[in-house]
Design a protein with these regions (language model features):
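Conserved acetyl-CoA pyrophosphate-binding loop and the N-cap/start of the following alpha-helix
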Residues: 107, 111-119
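Conserved GNAT-fold acetyl-CoA-binding loop/helix
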Residues: 21-50
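C-terminal "cap" of GNAT-fold acetyltransferases
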Residues: 129-146, 151-192
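A short, internal acetyl-CoA/4′-phosphopantetheine-binding micro-motif in the GNAT/acyltransferase core
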Residues: 65, 101-109, 137-139
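Conserved N-terminal entry element of GNAT/NAT acetyltransferase domains
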Residues: 1-14, 180, 185-192
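A conserved beta-turn-beta hairpin within the catalytic core of GNAT-like acetyltransferases
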Residues: 90-101, 108, 127-131
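A short helix-loop-beta-strand connector motif used in the catalytic cores of GNAT acetyltransferases and
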Residues: 44-63, 175-178
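Conserved beta-strand in the GNAT
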Residues: 63, 79-90, 97-102
Length: 192
């Protein structure tokens, strides 16, 4: 199914927060394979964090909406719910940051994530002039890291600790959480 893309506006913030939470936390997230429910409790993000992305220069929240949602799981899903989203941020040195990547849990594994990632890479390269896309992923998410590696990302060797003690980022269920940085060159991808 094809996706239509647009950038989030302030009115979209509640729906974006709900989508991100459903993809990563709680029992509902177990419908997809991106769940962090075994690693973290609490929130994944909040309205203030998403609003900051929407309002800040050089940052954007890309939204994906399914075109002709004829196969919606319920009528409510066909009526204005998001298929997925991701944060894009222009950084110095021709780099773009990719984060808060979420796909509706009941629709994961159907190619929507690949479409969203490809559009984010295109925007970063063509509209932001980025030569490289970078992201942070929980080191304990081996299956997710492998998914990104199959799409051309590689580990940079950089890591940072999880922000323990700050419930805004979730409540850890284990003491060894950390993030690894992944990177992918965006230039020269479509030369042929």
């Amino acid at each position: 199914m094809a996706l239509a893309f647009r950038f989030a506006e302030e009115r979209d913030v509640p729906a974006v927060v709900a989508l991100i939470e459903s993809a990563y936390r709680g029992e509902a997230s177990r419908a997809g394979w991106t769940t962090e429910a075994d690693l973290l409790d609490g929130q994944r993000t909040d309205a203030d964090a998403v609003l900051a992305v929407v309002r800040a220069p050089g940052r954007a929240m890309l939204l994906a909406e399914a075109e002709a949602e004829a196969e919606a799981e319920t009528e409510a899903e066909a009526d204005g719910q998001l298929a997925g989203c991701c944060q894009l941020e222009r950084r110095p040195s021709a780099e773009a940051y990719f984060g808060m990547f979420s796909v509706r849990p009941g629709r994961q594994g159907q190619g929507w994530g690949r479409q969203i990632l490809a559009e984010a890479e295109r925007l970063a390269r063509d509209d932001c002039g980025a030569a490289t896309m970078v992201m942070s992923v929980l080191a304990q998410r081996g299956e997710l890291i492998a998914w990104y590696e199959r799409r051309g990302y590689h580990r940079t060797g950089e890591s940072r600790p999880f922000p323990y003690g700050n419930a805004r980022y979730g409540i850890p269920k284990r003491p060894d959480l950390s993030f690894v940085t992944l990177s992918k060159p965006l230039v020269g991808l479509n030369l042929l």
